[in-house]
């Protein structure tokens, strides 16, 4: 948030100093919190902590503050923190209430191009749909308040920032691994969702600038972390305490038997799905109808009303409806990296089911819900490359390495 002595350049949307006249002392003055305020509504001043910095020669990091604090009541006190709406929906309110920020981004990208600087943008929030464009199907199946759908940026967000000159953007917040892109005749924007180090799948990204038009992204998975189990004895005490309270759901103690950090994170996801996601996200009747089914049952349901020869179904019995739901969350969290944790045979069987339910024209409510589920699974398992890949901005494409 603040300039360092070693920085070659540092500025904010409110600092008019150009790089040609840059000085660290001036940057320190401009970095003062009181000098980074704007009126979100008349009489309501709030901070915008965006900045651009050149930490190493010819690389500009553009930190965009996507938080937009909008007052609830214009007649109330502007200094009352509780009179402001939260900023958790991300970029959507930037378009209407932080137009100065968009203009500043345009100026920065133009200046970077003029001076042959590589510009890398980042913020807490995504610029592009992080559900591999399955958000409309997720809303139809689960409702508009599930799977963080309120945080999915409007398409206008990508359009505006792409036209402003942003080419690559890194985001967090969702704790998921994903790559999204938007292409027009003139622009190409890539949004990289960086996974969390403390959730499935634990990983970080390495960016290599190969040329002005090419960048390489590599995802490093944390399979092993020293002392990851050091606090397990304390969790065992928590488990024993939960056992004494019949009103509280208890997690599976077997998680404390995990042998690696990655295994721990996968078990953690499994418990999140069981204890939180299924009860909170999914229609109760849908789960009740599906919970006793296995893969073969789903296959036969998919064939209902379809004039097709039924394939060998015996191997579909190896997995259950619960496995399907968990695998869906694996893909939501880890994108293509989830394939490491799903048997190859089952992945092929999912492809068969995706095709069957896409073809199925039944009006039965449960079949329609399954149809939507497999459509979502297809989206999440076939997104842009998100493990090790190259972005070619000139050709406007992303390819696996």
What residue spans do the PLM features occupy?
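Extended active-site neighborhood of metal-dependent phosphoesterases/phosphodiesterases
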Residues: 1-103
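His/acidic metal-ligating clusters that form di-metal
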Residues: 54, 60-63, 71-184, 248-253, ...
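Short Pro/Gly-enriched beta-strand edge/turn motifs at strand-loop
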Residues: 27-37, 163, 185-191
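Active-site-proximal beta-strand elements of phosphoester/diester hydrolases
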Residues: 59-68, 188-195, 218-220
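Active-site-adjacent helix-turn-beta-strand microarchitecture at beta-sheet edges
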Residues: 1, 43-47, 170, 179-185, ...
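Non-catalytic terminal accessory segments
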Residues: 134, 227-401
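Short, solvent-exposed aromatic-acidic interface loops
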Residues: 218-229
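Hydrophobic residues embedded in beta-strands of well-ordered beta-sheets
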Residues: 60, 214-215, 398
């Amino acid at each position: 948030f603040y300039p360092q002595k070693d920085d070659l350049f540092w500025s904010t949307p409110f600092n008019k100093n150009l790089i040609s006249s840059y000085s660290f002392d001036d940057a320190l003055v401009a970095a003062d919190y009181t000098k980074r305020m704007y009126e979100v509504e008349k009489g309501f001043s709030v901070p915008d902590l965006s900045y651009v910095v050149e930490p190493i020669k010819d690389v500009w990091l553009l930190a965009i503050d996507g938080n937009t604090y909008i007052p609830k009541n214009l007649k109330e006190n502007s200094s009352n923190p509780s009179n402001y709406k939260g900023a958790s929906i991300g970029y959507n309110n930037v378009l209407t209430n932080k137009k100065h920020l968009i203009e500043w981004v345009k100026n920065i990208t133009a200046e970077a191009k003029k001076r042959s600087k590589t510009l890398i943008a980042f913020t807490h929030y995504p610029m592009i749909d992080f559900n591999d464009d399955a958000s409309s199907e997720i809303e139809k199946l689960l409702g508009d308040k599930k799977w963080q759908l309120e945080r999915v940026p409007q398409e206008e967000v990508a359009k505006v920032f792409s036209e402003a000159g942003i080419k690559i953007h890194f985001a967090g917040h969702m704790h998921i691994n994903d790559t999204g892109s938007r292409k027009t005749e003139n622009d190409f924007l890539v949004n990289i969702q960086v996974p969390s180090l403390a959730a499935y799948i634990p990983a970080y990204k390495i960016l290599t600038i190969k040329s002005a038009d090419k960048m390489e992204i590599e995802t490093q998975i944390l399979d092993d972390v020293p002392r990851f189990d050091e606090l397990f004895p304390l969790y065992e005490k928590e488990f024993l305490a939960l056992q004494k309270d019949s009103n509280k759901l208890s997690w599976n103690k077997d998680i404390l038997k995990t042998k690696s950090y990655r295994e721990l994170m996968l078990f953690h996801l499994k418990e999140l799905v069981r204890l939180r996601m299924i009860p909170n996200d999914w229609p109760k009747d849908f789960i009740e109808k599906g919970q006793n089914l296995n893969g073969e049952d789903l296959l036969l349901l998919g064939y209902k009303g379809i004039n097709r020869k039924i394939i060998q179904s015996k191997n579909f019995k190896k997995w259950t409806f619960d496995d399907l739901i968990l695998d869906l969350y694996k893909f939501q969290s880890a994108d293509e990296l989830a394939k490491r944790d799903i048997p190859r045979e089952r992945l092929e069987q999912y492809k068969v089911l995706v095709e069957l339910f896409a073809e199925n024209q039944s009006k039965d409510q449960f079949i329609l819900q399954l149809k939507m589920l497999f459509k979502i699974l297809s989206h999440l398992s076939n997104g842009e490359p998100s493990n090790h890949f190259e972005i070619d901005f000139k050709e406007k494409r992303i390819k696996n390495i």
